Design a protein with these regions (language model features):
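Flexible N-lobe loop architecture of eukaryotic-like protein kinase catalytic domains
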Residues: 21, 66, 75-78
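Activation segment signature within eukaryotic-like protein kinase domains
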Residues: 120-121
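Conserved short submotifs of the Hanks-type protein kinase catalytic core
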Residues: 89-103, 107, 111
């Protein structure tokens, strides 16, 4: 059941203004706080959850919470900021910044100069590397999920697919499917940093050509071929053309293994280090620790189906997505159905 306009959340701290969108198993709302500031609240979509078996539903909730916590710990100028997490009824929620500006989805209706497009791609590459270091995949990279702040050239990556596509692939529209590699449309194929590489390369393809590439599923079935972007826009440099094709290789093992490797193919490294990366500053570590403490204090007991879901908190290592730089508390997922 969706929250209605005017509904109060988190002991009256937030007021729902409208529904912003639904993607995968999540739903996002525009809300205001007590001072009238706008923010985004993201949680799981109860209507979609009802279509899952009880065991898969609990597993998805665990994954959503764990990945939400990783996103909260990802402090980076090009990653959407999570203000806080809280529990409303039976659902875990994220209160996030609301970004004033336009998405690259609006800009992709025109062909961007290569230099401008690469500037946005480097920013998104840095954002993804920061997320991957937290053990978090995005799995939904596309122009519409890259916001450019009003009056600036600063891009921000939004709408992380928390828990959804990783184990529960869903039917997507064709315009979204062109950014999805084959492993995102399968329940059995492994995902990794190379998954986001494909989507970021496809995003650059669209920004430089104004055209949508053939979908990975059509290419796999032999129904279509991937047209090299330089054949569409002759102004694209040979180096960028080759990097896009490398990032959009059909089979995961044929792609660059990490976003950093792919950015190097584009020639975007700076003295061997991508800007904005490196050793995490001390203040960021403190923020991460305080975030974990806040989560533990804020997560209250809520019973689902007679089981203490929110009490099921145990230490767990981050998944092997590159390497995690933090070790917060996570929810233990129930056994997966055979």
């Amino acid at each position: 059941m969706a929250w209605i306009i005017g509904q109060k959340l988190h002991n009256g701290q937030y007021t729902i203004e409208k529904t912003l969108g639904k993607a995968g198993f999540s739903i996002t709302y525009l809300a205001t706080d007590a001072q009238g500031n706008e923010l985004v609240i993201k949680t799981l979509n109860e209507d979609r959850l009802k279509k899952l078996t009880p065991l898969r539903r609990e597993s998805l909730k665990c994954k959503f919470v764990n990945e939400a916590r990783r996103l909260e710990g990802c402090r980076h100028p090009h990653v959407i900021q999570v203000y806080k997490t809280f529990v409303e009824g039976q659902f875990f929620c994220l209160a996030m910044e609301y970004i004033q500006g336009k998405s690259l989805g609006n800009l992709s209706q025109r062909v961007l100069p290569e230099k401008e497009a690469l500037s946005y791609i480097q920013q998104m590459g840095e954002a993804l590397i920061a997320a991957h270091q937290q053990g978090l995949l995005h799995q939904n990279v596309k122009p519409a999920n890259i916001m450019v702040r009003a009056g600036q050239y600063q891009a921000v990556l939004i709408d992380f697919d928390l828990g959804g596509k990783f184990e529960y692939p869903v039917t997507v529209g064709w315009q979204d499917e062109v950014f999805a590699p084959i492993e995102l449309q399968s329940k059995t194929r492994s995902r990794g940093t190379f998954t986001d590489v494909y989507s970021l390369a496809a995003t650059l393809y669209v920004l430089l050509t104004g055209k949508l590439p053939a979908t990975s599923s059509d290419r796999q079935k032999g129904k279509a071929d991937l047209i090299p972007p330089k054949q569409i826009n002759s102004q694209i440099s040979q180096r960028v053309n080759k990097a896009i094709l490398a990032g959009m290789k059909l089979e995961p093992e044929a792609r660059p293994k990490s976003v950093l490797d792919w950015l190097k193919l584009l020639g975007l490294q700076r003295d061997g280090v991508i800007s904005g990366l490196g050793k995490k500053p001390r203040w960021a570590m403190v923020v991460g620790i305080l975030g974990v403490v806040g989560i533990v204090a804020g997560v209250v007991s809520a019973s689902l189906g007679g089981t203490g879901f929110w009490d099921n908190i145990i230490p767990e290592s981050s998944p092997d997505v590159n390497s995690s730089t933090s070790s917060p508390l996570y929810l233990k997922s129930p056994e997966t159905e055979e």
